[in-house]
């Protein structure tokens, strides 16, 4: 799409905001274009409840969880909480395609984003090399059971969709986990 030249004058406050976001978006043009896309969204108005939910997660360290998963956790059925979690549905919904069309890296990147938004983990890093992809997750809940529960979600999807193409090596600790996937030759 052709670009159009725009010349304008901004307030100091507007310019400070642009400067603040430049490192994340790459430049002034990219910041302005991202801001305009946000303004043009159909659902741009957040209700008071939407804002409260965001504040609960960010300010009070809440996390999000599907209702059926929450029920299984309360009933003490961790295996069902993982196997019947909404992760699979959420990934397909977010990527707008079925799992048969979703590559392993794409799945892991979506989980990374979702877990950060839902405050499930404190740090997630995905690295890749020639024939391998690794996801490293860290949390501050300091319980091996938490690390195992989180890793089980990814491994459950791995077993269903990626086991034929990839092998996995896992390392789980009280602070997090690493899953390294190797493409089968």
UniProtKB/Swiss-Prot annotation:
It comes from the Archaea. This is Uncharacterized protein AF_0136. It comes from Archaeoglobus fulgidus (strain ATCC 49558 / DSM 4304 / JCM 9628 / NBRC 100126 / VC-16).
